[in-house]
Amino acid sequence: SLTGVFPSGLIETKVSAAKITENYQFDSRIRLNSIGFIPNHSKKATIAANCSTFYVVKEDGTIVYTGTATSMFDNDTKETVYIADFSSVNEEGTYYLAVPGVGKSVNFKIAMNVYEDAFKTAMLGMYLLRCGTSVSATYNGIHYSHGPCHTNDAYLDYINGQHTKKDSTKGWHDAGDYNKYVVNAGITVGSMFLAWEHFKDQLEPVALEIPEKNNSIPDFLDELKYEIDWILTMQYPDGSGRVAHKVSTRNFGGFIMPENEHDERFFVPWSSAATADFVAMTAMAARIFRPYDPQYAEKCINAAKVSYEFLKNNPANVFANQSGFSTGEYATVSDADDRLWAAAEMWETLGDEEYLRDFENRAAQFSKKIEADFDWDNVANLGMFTYLLSERPGKNPALVQSIKDSLLSTADSIVRTSQNHGYGRTLGTTYYWGCNGTVVRQTMILQVANKISPNNDYVNAALDAISHVFGRNYYNRSYVTGLGINPPMNPHDRRSGADGIWEPWPGYLVGGGWPGPKDWVDIQDSYQTNEIAINWNAALIYALAGFVNYNSPQNEVLYGDVNDDGKVNSTDLTLLKRYVLKAVSTLPSSKAEKNADVNRDGRVNSSDVTILSRYLIRVIEKLPI
């Protein structure tokens, strides 16, 4: 066997062709990502039992890796746990962890495409939430369907005092209930459109089982269009640009199938937050659909302009009058974040200086540019990301720098939080209703940071967040229906409770435990911990999108990473200077030589030193040039 030093901390490791001889039994104290892992990235398990040695074992019993687990006290769950790090196992296959004196884990895969099915299942979940139509799908041999629902959406009584109807069909049911809320659509659509813009080449070829699968629009965007079609109906019929806050029954309905809910549904009066979120969503839709359906794009941007103009002339934060309704309020404390996001998306789509100035003036009012913890009630991050990654000219360099600094500081903080948590939870010890959604939403911060300043720590922390919701948690359970180890069976979801089928509808992330890590209960009545929601699912979709049709960085050139450690920093500049001055004769690898050629002229010389130094002080925004 081969013996060596594992880089994360002088631990002896062995690679051996020996076979497991002991009969290990499954033990739920060995907690890991039951979906699996990507080659050349972090792979960790948490063992809630006293142990030392662990083995990574192939399905046929061959031991491919022997390691020593390291102990730590988890301040969150208040238990001593042992971390098994097997990141150096990269051969594709199916494995399990065997821990002497404890037992074995669930089987898991190591593969480049390990998240493809999970991504498609989360997208299937969105399709199955469609309102105003019938839906039908077979998953794991079980058929899920319902008939056309809510085809009378919606009445205008609370808008104009008349019991008349304006079409507001389509869109997704929001959560465990069947209502439709513009403000929660904001973070949902924004997250999914950003997934498209950040990972377009990876998502464009993905085939989904949806009715529109044979048209000329990518399937991922087809699903989003179904929601935008509804969003467009939410403008007031008077042409003012005001946007209704939601379409809803007066009270929450019972646990019945959607086609059996016949209570009248109404447009609920406008709010400034809903109007601003409408602007942002339709502005994004305009630029994203333009290559595929220019007429639709034009419809979207024209609607966005009308509502933006209204907001400009009506600067006050206006809350929706929801006095006739007991359904979800989605009432934001402030609309400053919504208006900032609207300005960013209008500028990115149209390029007019008016929108740029609006965004920059608003962004200057935010003392913290990037928040680690964000959801429907704080969408400022979405606008900051769009502005920061925009290739349009005219940005304020000082503001760009301020947002970058905040982004990288926040991303670094998330990495530290994950590394110091016994289960790699990126949100640390913070818990509230729907916190699982935030855990996977934080991958957005990490991925944008990785675009601005490539760092494998950011990518691995994003994978930690995914691992947490698929089994590396206190329960050793997946938090996503239909996926992974022992997933939720009783979500707070009216379809799952009313259809007479034992298995819940698939592809939904449940909210997770609160007020603490041990407070999740898998029962239908626990809306506090076991509800589903489009904003949480969209966050999961973003998290998984980054690793669909993924190319391992092992094979990619990371310009500026002269020492080939997966990061670009001052250490690389020092090595590059020494190499150019011939103080060292070689770079660590052939990949490092490619990484060092930051101007791509086929040579490594003083020009590369100059460019890399300017990049590190952020005079240059991107490598290579």
Curated annotation (Swiss-Prot):
InterPro entries: 6-hairpin_glycosidase_sf (IPR008928), 6hp_glycosidase-like_sf (IPR012341), Cellulase_Ig-like (IPR004197), Dockerin_1_rpt (IPR002105), Dockerin_dom (IPR016134), Dockerin_dom_sf (IPR036439), EF_Hand_1_Ca_BS (IPR018247), Glyco_hydro_9 (IPR001701). The active site is at D177, H492, D522, E531. Residues 555-625 form the Dockerin domain. CDD domains: Dockerin_I (cd14256), E_set_Cellulase_N (cd02850). Pfam families: CelD_N, Dockerin_1, Glyco_hydro_9. One of its GO terms (molecular function) is cellulase activity. Changing D522A: 1% of wild-type activity. Its cofactor is Ca(2+). Belongs to the glycosyl hydrolase 9 (cellulase E) family. This is Endoglucanase D. It comes from Acetivibrio thermocellus (Hungateiclostridium thermocellum). The gene is celD.
